[in-house]
Amino acid sequence: MRFTKYIYLIIYAYACACLPLGAQNDVLAAQKGVIKGGYDFWVYTPADYETTQDSTPVILFLHGASLCGRDLSRVRRYGPLHALQMGRNIPALIIAPQNPGGAWNPKKINDVLDWTLSHYAADTTRIYVIGMSLGGYGTMDYAGTYPHRVAAAMALCGGCTLRDMQGLGELPLWILHGTADRAVGIRHSQTVVEALRREKNDQRLRFDWLNGQSHGALGRLFYMEKTYDWLFAHTVADSGRVADRLITITNADLKQAYRNITRRKEPMHVK
Protein backbone atom coordinates (compact mmCIF):
# COMPACT_ATOMS: atom_id res chain seq x y z
CA MET A 1 0.00 0.00 0.00
CA ARG A 2 1.14 3.60 -0.58
CA PHE A 3 1.18 4.30 3.18
CA THR A 4 3.61 1.43 3.68
CA LYS A 5 5.85 2.75 0.91
CA TYR A 6 6.24 6.10 2.61
CA ILE A 7 6.94 4.51 5.98
CA TYR A 8 9.95 2.86 4.29
CA LEU A 9 11.00 6.20 2.79
CA ILE A 10 10.79 7.89 6.20
CA ILE A 11 12.99 5.15 7.70
CA TYR A 12 15.45 5.55 4.80
CA ALA A 13 15.60 9.34 5.21
CA TYR A 14 16.12 8.97 8.96
CA ALA A 15 18.98 6.53 8.40
CA CYS A 16 20.61 8.93 5.95
CA ALA A 17 20.36 11.80 8.42
CA CYS A 18 21.44 9.98 11.56
CA LEU A 19 24.63 8.20 10.54
CA PRO A 20 27.64 10.47 11.11
CA LEU A 21 30.23 9.86 8.46
CA GLY A 22 33.04 9.89 10.98
CA ALA A 23 31.49 6.93 12.83
CA GLN A 24 30.99 4.67 9.85
CA ASN A 25 31.94 1.04 10.18
CA ASP A 26 30.37 -0.27 7.00
CA VAL A 27 32.01 -3.30 5.42
CA LEU A 28 32.66 -4.41 1.85
CA ALA A 29 33.49 -8.11 1.61
CA ALA A 30 34.82 -9.88 -1.49
CA GLN A 31 33.38 -13.33 -2.17
CA LYS A 32 35.58 -15.24 -4.60
CA GLY A 33 35.08 -18.84 -5.66
CA VAL A 34 32.27 -19.48 -3.19
CA ILE A 35 29.87 -20.56 -5.95
CA LYS A 36 31.27 -23.29 -8.19
CA GLY A 37 31.10 -22.11 -11.80
CA GLY A 38 29.38 -18.92 -10.67
CA TYR A 39 30.14 -15.23 -10.37
CA ASP A 40 32.52 -13.66 -7.89
CA PHE A 41 30.90 -10.74 -6.09
CA TRP A 42 31.03 -8.06 -3.43
CA VAL A 43 28.68 -7.87 -0.45
CA TYR A 44 28.32 -4.50 1.26
CA THR A 45 26.78 -4.16 4.73
CA PRO A 46 25.87 -0.67 6.02
CA ALA A 47 27.09 0.85 9.27
CA ASP A 48 23.97 -0.05 11.26
CA TYR A 49 23.63 -3.57 9.87
CA GLU A 50 24.13 -5.29 13.22
CA THR A 51 20.95 -3.63 14.55
CA THR A 52 18.82 -3.68 11.38
CA GLN A 53 19.61 -7.07 9.85
CA ASP A 54 16.14 -8.51 9.13
CA SER A 55 14.81 -5.12 8.01
CA THR A 56 17.74 -4.33 5.70
CA PRO A 57 16.76 -4.07 2.02
CA VAL A 58 18.87 -5.69 -0.71
CA ILE A 59 20.19 -4.07 -3.88
CA LEU A 60 21.62 -6.17 -6.71
CA PHE A 61 23.90 -4.09 -8.94
CA LEU A 62 24.72 -5.36 -12.43
CA HIS A 63 27.58 -3.56 -14.17
CA GLY A 64 28.18 -2.84 -17.83
CA ALA A 65 30.61 -4.45 -20.28
CA SER A 66 33.53 -2.17 -19.36
CA LEU A 67 33.77 -3.79 -15.91
CA CYS A 68 33.68 -7.41 -17.11
CA GLY A 69 36.65 -9.62 -16.28
CA ARG A 70 38.26 -11.40 -13.35
CA ASP A 71 39.51 -8.39 -11.39
CA LEU A 72 36.76 -7.84 -8.82
CA SER A 73 38.07 -4.39 -7.91
CA ARG A 74 36.84 -3.13 -11.29
CA VAL A 75 33.24 -3.39 -10.07
CA ARG A 76 33.95 -0.47 -7.73
CA ARG A 77 34.73 1.95 -10.56
CA TYR A 78 31.13 3.18 -10.88
CA GLY A 79 27.72 2.31 -9.54
CA PRO A 80 26.49 1.99 -5.95
CA LEU A 81 29.86 0.83 -4.56
CA HIS A 82 31.59 3.87 -6.01
CA ALA A 83 28.75 6.11 -4.80
CA LEU A 84 29.33 4.77 -1.28
CA GLN A 85 33.03 5.46 -1.64
CA MET A 86 32.25 9.06 -2.61
CA GLY A 87 29.99 9.53 0.41
CA ARG A 88 26.47 8.63 -0.69
CA ASN A 89 24.72 6.86 2.19
CA ILE A 90 22.80 3.81 0.93
CA PRO A 91 21.21 1.91 3.84
CA ALA A 92 21.03 -1.45 2.12
CA LEU A 93 22.84 -4.73 1.76
CA ILE A 94 24.39 -4.34 -1.70
CA ILE A 95 25.39 -7.31 -3.84
CA ALA A 96 27.64 -6.55 -6.80
CA PRO A 97 28.64 -9.59 -8.89
CA GLN A 98 31.25 -9.47 -11.64
CA ASN A 99 30.43 -10.85 -15.04
CA PRO A 100 33.60 -12.34 -16.61
CA GLY A 101 32.23 -11.66 -20.10
CA GLY A 102 29.20 -12.12 -22.32
CA ALA A 103 25.56 -11.68 -21.38
CA TRP A 104 24.45 -11.75 -17.76
CA ASN A 105 23.01 -15.13 -16.78
CA PRO A 106 19.81 -14.84 -14.67
CA LYS A 107 20.40 -18.23 -13.03
CA LYS A 108 23.93 -17.28 -11.98
CA ILE A 109 22.68 -13.95 -10.62
CA ASN A 110 20.06 -15.84 -8.65
CA ASP A 111 22.74 -18.18 -7.28
CA VAL A 112 24.63 -15.14 -5.98
CA LEU A 113 21.47 -13.83 -4.32
CA ASP A 114 20.71 -17.24 -2.78
CA TRP A 115 24.25 -17.57 -1.39
CA THR A 116 24.16 -14.07 0.08
CA LEU A 117 20.78 -14.53 1.75
CA SER A 118 21.95 -17.82 3.24
CA HIS A 119 24.87 -16.00 4.89
CA TYR A 120 23.40 -12.55 5.61
CA ALA A 121 20.07 -11.60 7.18
CA ALA A 122 17.94 -9.17 5.13
CA ASP A 123 14.37 -8.21 4.26
CA THR A 124 13.55 -10.60 1.40
CA THR A 125 10.41 -8.63 0.50
CA ARG A 126 12.63 -5.70 -0.48
CA ILE A 127 15.07 -7.00 -3.08
CA TYR A 128 15.87 -4.50 -5.85
CA VAL A 129 17.84 -4.77 -9.08
CA ILE A 130 19.56 -1.93 -10.89
CA GLY A 131 21.98 -2.10 -13.81
CA MET A 132 23.42 -0.07 -16.65
CA SER A 133 24.21 -0.92 -20.28
CA LEU A 134 25.00 -4.65 -20.33
CA GLY A 135 23.78 -4.53 -16.74
CA GLY A 136 20.57 -2.89 -17.95
CA TYR A 137 20.07 -5.96 -20.09
CA GLY A 138 20.91 -8.14 -17.11
CA THR A 139 18.44 -6.24 -14.95
CA MET A 140 15.54 -6.86 -17.32
CA ASP A 141 16.54 -10.45 -18.02
CA TYR A 142 16.80 -11.22 -14.30
CA ALA A 143 13.66 -9.33 -13.26
CA GLY A 144 11.68 -10.88 -16.11
CA THR A 145 12.84 -14.36 -15.07
CA TYR A 146 12.26 -13.92 -11.33
CA PRO A 147 9.55 -11.21 -11.10
CA HIS A 148 8.09 -12.47 -7.83
CA ARG A 149 11.45 -12.15 -6.12
CA VAL A 150 12.20 -8.56 -7.15
CA ALA A 151 10.36 -5.70 -5.43
CA ALA A 152 11.37 -3.21 -8.15
CA ALA A 153 13.91 -2.89 -10.95
CA MET A 154 15.58 0.03 -12.69
CA ALA A 155 17.21 -0.59 -16.07
CA LEU A 156 19.51 2.12 -17.45
CA CYS A 157 20.38 2.32 -21.14
CA GLY A 158 19.93 -1.41 -21.67
CA GLY A 159 17.48 -3.80 -23.29
CA CYS A 160 16.21 -7.35 -22.90
CA THR A 161 17.11 -10.70 -24.48
CA LEU A 162 14.14 -12.67 -23.14
CA ARG A 163 11.84 -14.09 -25.80
CA ASP A 164 9.00 -14.05 -23.30
CA MET A 165 8.83 -10.67 -21.55
CA GLN A 166 5.63 -11.46 -19.66
CA GLY A 167 7.45 -11.40 -16.32
CA LEU A 168 8.56 -7.79 -16.80
CA GLY A 169 4.96 -6.69 -16.45
CA GLU A 170 4.61 -8.34 -13.06
CA LEU A 171 6.78 -5.92 -11.07
CA PRO A 172 7.48 -2.18 -10.92
CA LEU A 173 10.03 -1.54 -13.68
CA TRP A 174 11.55 1.82 -14.59
CA ILE A 175 13.44 1.97 -17.88
CA LEU A 176 15.59 5.05 -18.56
CA HIS A 177 17.59 5.78 -21.70
CA GLY A 178 19.29 8.84 -23.19
CA THR A 179 18.18 9.91 -26.65
CA ALA A 180 21.81 10.64 -27.64
CA ASP A 181 23.14 7.22 -26.59
CA ARG A 182 25.54 6.00 -29.29
CA ALA A 183 26.79 2.93 -27.41
CA VAL A 184 23.43 1.21 -26.82
CA GLY A 185 20.82 2.89 -29.00
CA ILE A 186 17.55 3.93 -27.42
CA ARG A 187 15.71 1.43 -29.64
CA HIS A 188 16.96 -1.33 -27.35
CA SER A 189 14.80 0.06 -24.54
CA GLN A 190 11.97 1.22 -26.78
CA THR A 191 11.54 -2.31 -28.12
CA VAL A 192 10.86 -3.58 -24.60
CA VAL A 193 8.36 -0.81 -23.90
CA GLU A 194 6.56 -1.46 -27.18
CA ALA A 195 6.39 -5.21 -26.50
CA LEU A 196 4.87 -4.69 -23.05
CA ARG A 197 2.38 -2.12 -24.34
CA ARG A 198 1.39 -4.33 -27.24
CA GLU A 199 0.51 -7.10 -24.79
CA LYS A 200 -1.25 -4.60 -22.49
CA ASN A 201 1.24 -5.66 -19.84
CA ASP A 202 2.56 -2.20 -19.00
CA GLN A 203 0.52 -1.21 -15.94
CA ARG A 204 3.61 -1.37 -13.69
CA LEU A 205 6.00 0.05 -16.28
CA ARG A 206 7.65 3.45 -16.18
CA PHE A 207 9.93 4.73 -18.91
CA ASP A 208 11.75 7.99 -19.53
CA TRP A 209 13.73 9.04 -22.58
CA LEU A 210 16.17 11.68 -21.35
CA ASN A 211 16.58 14.20 -24.13
CA GLY A 212 20.14 14.75 -25.33
CA GLN A 213 21.73 12.48 -22.74
CA SER A 214 24.61 10.21 -23.74
CA HIS A 215 25.29 6.64 -22.67
CA GLY A 216 27.65 7.54 -19.84
CA ALA A 217 25.43 10.31 -18.50
CA LEU A 218 22.98 7.82 -17.06
CA GLY A 219 25.68 6.52 -14.75
CA ARG A 220 24.95 9.59 -12.64
CA LEU A 221 21.77 7.95 -11.42
CA PHE A 222 23.80 5.75 -9.08
CA TYR A 223 24.85 8.85 -7.15
CA MET A 224 21.35 10.33 -6.77
CA GLU A 225 19.25 9.92 -3.64
CA LYS A 226 16.11 9.83 -5.80
CA THR A 227 17.23 6.57 -7.39
CA TYR A 228 17.25 4.77 -4.07
CA ASP A 229 14.10 6.57 -2.88
CA TRP A 230 12.24 5.07 -5.83
CA LEU A 231 13.56 1.55 -5.32
CA PHE A 232 12.87 1.61 -1.58
CA ALA A 233 9.29 2.76 -2.17
CA HIS A 234 8.38 -0.80 -3.22
CA THR A 235 8.00 -4.21 -1.62
CA VAL A 236 6.75 -7.51 -2.98
CA ALA A 237 4.11 -7.36 -0.23
CA ASP A 238 2.48 -4.27 -1.81
CA SER A 239 -1.12 -4.82 -2.83
CA GLY A 240 -1.19 -4.80 -6.64
CA ARG A 241 2.56 -4.09 -6.76
CA VAL A 242 1.91 -0.60 -8.12
CA ALA A 243 4.88 1.38 -9.44
CA ASP A 244 5.58 4.68 -7.69
CA ARG A 245 5.04 7.55 -10.15
CA LEU A 246 5.58 10.49 -7.81
CA ILE A 247 9.38 10.40 -7.87
CA THR A 248 10.75 11.84 -11.11
CA ILE A 249 14.20 11.95 -12.68
CA THR A 250 15.03 14.73 -15.13
CA ASN A 251 18.02 16.14 -16.98
CA ALA A 252 18.29 18.73 -14.21
CA ASP A 253 18.59 15.94 -11.65
CA LEU A 254 21.41 14.33 -13.64
CA LYS A 255 23.23 17.64 -13.78
CA GLN A 256 23.11 17.97 -9.99
CA ALA A 257 23.75 14.29 -9.21
CA TYR A 258 26.94 14.88 -7.22
CA ARG A 259 26.04 18.13 -5.49
CA ASN A 260 24.53 16.87 -2.24
CA ILE A 261 27.04 14.11 -1.50
CA THR A 262 29.12 14.63 1.64
CA ARG A 263 32.59 13.22 1.20
CA ARG A 264 33.41 10.38 3.58
CA LYS A 265 35.75 11.14 6.45
CA GLU A 266 36.82 7.52 6.75
CA PRO A 267 37.05 4.78 4.10
CA MET A 268 34.80 1.75 4.34
CA HIS A 269 36.36 -1.44 5.66
CA VAL A 270 37.24 -3.69 2.71
CA LYS A 271 38.02 -7.34 3.23
Features from the language model and the residues they span:
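A domain-start/cap signature at the N-terminus of enzymes
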Residues: 21-58, 137, 142, 154, ...
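Gly/Ser-rich "nucleophile elbow"/oxyanion-hole loop immediately N-terminal to the catalytic nucleophile
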Residues: 48-54, 102-133
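Active-site machinery of serine-nucleophile hydrolases
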Residues: 55-58, 62-110
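Short alpha-helix in the alpha/beta-hydrolase fold that links the catalytic acid
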Residues: 73-75, 185-195
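Primarily recognizes the serine-hydrolase "nucleophile elbow" in alpha/beta-hydrolase
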Residues: 116-119, 125-169
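Short beta-strand/loop motif that positions the catalytic acidic residue
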Residues: 174-177, 181
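Catalytic histidine neighborhood in serine/cysteine hydrolases
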Residues: 196-217
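Post-His helix in hydrolase/transferase enzymes
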Residues: 218-229
